[in-house]
A protein has these predicted regions:
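Alpha-helical transmembrane segments and their immediate juxtamembrane cytosolic regions
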Residues: 1-215
Length: 215
């Protein structure tokens, strides 16, 4: 419906979407969560990011026409979309929420799961303040890895590159640590009602802007 299903013009229907990426990313992350322990899942996350980089950098695209592997016309994500994704691509030859670029989005979901597991962990001597410090350190590691990786695999949201996953993951972990410290550790909760309502209805608000003119 959001992308025009009820128009019944299926040649112009865009099948990919932000919500589909969120759903698929979390679905596969959840399947891994119920099947494997955190160490195996951490290894799978690394394999996803490294494998995606190697595929994007070194798998040739037959119809690239000499364009580079990270360009609009020459990237592997767009080639797979043109082969297998039905309907309309958002950018004609490429869709930023396409099939192959959803694979590293699973790693993004996994980072969120690891963060939640860490916060919920109960261990003798592990205080909430210690958890915050560890999250800050984890964010620093992610940022350094992402920036170094970007030298050979540019930070690119539309391609959801592995360096993008690391850098955005770092900022997200830091923001989570900040609000966890303020709200849960210090107990400053009175100002949070507005943001709680927004957070609990984020998908509704995202969809509403498509149908309601707020301006």
């Amino acid at each position: 419906v959001y992308n025009g299903l009820l128009s019944f013009e299926f040649d112009h229907l865009r099948c990919a979407s932000v919500l589909a990426r969120i759903g698929l990313g979390w679905m596969f992350a959840a399947l891994l969560f119920v099947r494997f322990g955190w160490k195996v899942r951490a290894g799978i996350t690394v394999l996803i990011l490294v494998g995606y980089w190697l595929a994007m950098a070194f798998v040739p695209v037959p119809d690239a026409g000499g364009a580079g592997p990270f360009t609009l016309e020459g990237n592997l994500v767009g080639y797979i979309d043109r082969l297998f994704l039905p309907g309309r691509l958002h950018e004609t030859v490429f869709d930023p929420e396409g099939l192959f670029s959803t694979v590293p989005a699973i790693a993004t979901a996994m980072l969120g799961m690891f963060t939640g597991e860490w916060i919920k962990l109960r261990k003798e001597g592990l205080t909430d303040r210690n958890k915050v410090l560890c999250l800050v350190g984890a964010g620093a590691v992610l940022l350094i890895v992402g920036l170094l990786w970007s030298l050979v695999f540019p930070i690119n949201k539309k391609l959801w590159t592995s360096s993008f996953v690391c850098v955005v993951g770092a900022y997200s972990v830091w923001m989570f640590a900040l609000f966890f410290y303020i709200i849960d550790v210090l107990g400053w909760r009175k100002w949070t009602l507005f943001f709680t309502v927004i957070g609990m209805n984020s998908i509704t608000i995202y969809l509403a802007q498509r149908f309601i003119r707020f301006s």
